A protein has these predicted regions:
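Terminal targeting signals and extreme-terminal segments of soluble enzymes
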Residues: 1-129
Length: 129
């Protein structure tokens, strides 16, 4: 890769739903080449996007559609090509207009990779699919 080009990052191509319960969603994914940053580690934006997506799914699991209102993330350990990540999202506040979701990302060695908190703004009751 040359220094003057951005590396394309992909997030949603290879994840598996482990659990989808009211207020709690778990997915796994493998870090692939398109998940890496310029230095060969999982891109922070990739990790953040996984957490954001899970927060949306947790909101849906409570019966409501929601969008991200505020978020924060702490990156604790780098991930590399081939690592298996488990993304665990839990609703810690199930309010009428907002939901707060805590997300933990761990690797295959059960080491914490990132911890995030998302405040989700409720946009309406989920319509049955």
């Amino acid at each position: 890769m040359s220094d003057n080009h951005l590396h394309e990052i992909r997030v949603f191509e290879n994840f598996d739903m482990v659990s989808f319960e009211k207020g709690h969603v778990i997915v796994t994914t493998e870090v692939v080449d398109k998940s890496l940053n310029y230095y060969g580690f999982a891109h922070g934006g990739y990790i953040f996007t996984l957490c954001d997506q899970i927060s949306g799914l947790v909101s849906i699991s409570t019966g409501f559609d929601a969008v991200t209102l505020q978020s924060s993330i702490n990156y604790l350990k780098s991930s590399k090509l081939g690592d298996t990540l488990l993304i665990d999202g839990r609703c810690v506040h199930d309010g009428r207009t907002t939901k707060v979701v805590d997300v933990t990302v761990t690797n295959q060695l059960k080491q914490e990779v990132a911890k995030a908190t998302f405040t989700m703004f409720v946009t309406g009751k989920r319509k049955d699919d």
